[in-house]
Amino acid sequence: MRVLIVCLGNICRSPMGEGALRARLDEARLSRRIEVDSAGTGDWHAGDPPDPRAIRCARGHGVDISGLRARQVRGADFEHFDWLLCADGSNLRDLQRLAPAPLRDKVALWLPWAGVEERDDIPDPYTGGMDDFERAWQLVDTAARQTVARLTRS
């Protein structure tokens, strides 16, 4: 199983999501069976590390994302990954436009896909403060935990 977590620039939500999901898969001893990566719909930050606030937030929860580097979604990702899970509706619409028609069903909003019912989107913390990063972390970590639960049922 291969999962790609997607946000806008791949420096805040999706690297935190990748880190959270990897950590939860490690806890469940599933990391050898499930590949996780992250990417952005835009290329502005390609090659950059995650935002320092995202690194600090994840580290505060025992997850190190400092070694990750931003990249843009590529056409090959639609073939390679089983699921491309988006942080928000804008990311979803962008990927649905890019995806070949037969592969569009691989693209989904991460929170509803994982069974997180309280909201659909993970708000982008980029223009906010640490409280916004913490709120985003809580959502990606909840999604990560519920993703592991979903994948262990299948």
Label every model-predicted segment.
Residues 1-80, 149-154:
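Conserved active-site segments centered on acidic
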Residues 5, 85-86:
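Hydrophobic beta-strand core positions in alpha/beta domains
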Residues 14, 88-89:
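Helix N-cap/beta->alpha junction signal
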Residues 83, 89-154:
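Phosphate-binding/catalytic loops
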